[in-house]
């Protein structure tokens, strides 16, 4: 029960850290704070954010498995990576868009999740951008 509560709190904080920068990026094409979202992914996965975002998709999923929380956070991470990819694509940065989408798809395959489905922590965000 304590682990479940701890994980729920981590996911809540993750969603809070991601929501505003993703909203600004979607609404205004403002990528200035997208690094905060990428840092939040690293923190959630208990990895150095700079290293985490540079990992090849297969390496990222391996590290998530080794951390032992991959199954518990995979949908949320894949969902956020897909949004980052979409924002990069909208602003013409195809290289970063492709990298983030590849990471999201690898997570979805490795952990049998669907990053296109909105996790409950992001429902309010999803409603504001649609």
Set out the residue ranges of the language-model regions.
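N-terminal alpha-helical interaction modules that lie
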Residues: 1-74, 109, 128-130
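Structural register within alpha-helical repeat arrays
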Residues: 20-21, 40, 77, 84, ...
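Residue at a conserved register position within TPR or TPR-like alpha-solenoid repeats
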Residues: 24-25, 81, 88, 108
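Residues in the short coil linking paired helices within alpha-helical repeat scaffolds
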Residues: 29-30, 93, 100
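The tetratricopeptide repeat
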Residues: 73-76, 80, 117-125
């Amino acid at each position: 029960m304590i682990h479940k509560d701890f994980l729920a709190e981590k996911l809540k904080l993750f969603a809070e850290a991601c929501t505003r920068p993703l909203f600004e990026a979607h609404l205004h094409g403002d990528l200035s704070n997208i690094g905060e979202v990428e840092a939040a992914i690293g923190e959630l996965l208990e990895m150095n954010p700079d290293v985490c975002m540079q990992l090849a998709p297969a390496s990222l999923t391996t590290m998530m498995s080794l951390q032992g929380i991959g199954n518990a956070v995979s949908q949320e991470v894949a969902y956020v990576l897909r949004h980052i990819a979409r924002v990069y694509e909208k602003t013409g940065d195809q290289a970063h868009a492709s990298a983030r989408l590849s990471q999201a798809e690898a997570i979805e395959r490795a952990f049998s999740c669907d990053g296109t489905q909105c996790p409950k922590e992001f429902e309010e965000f999803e409603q504001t951008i649609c």
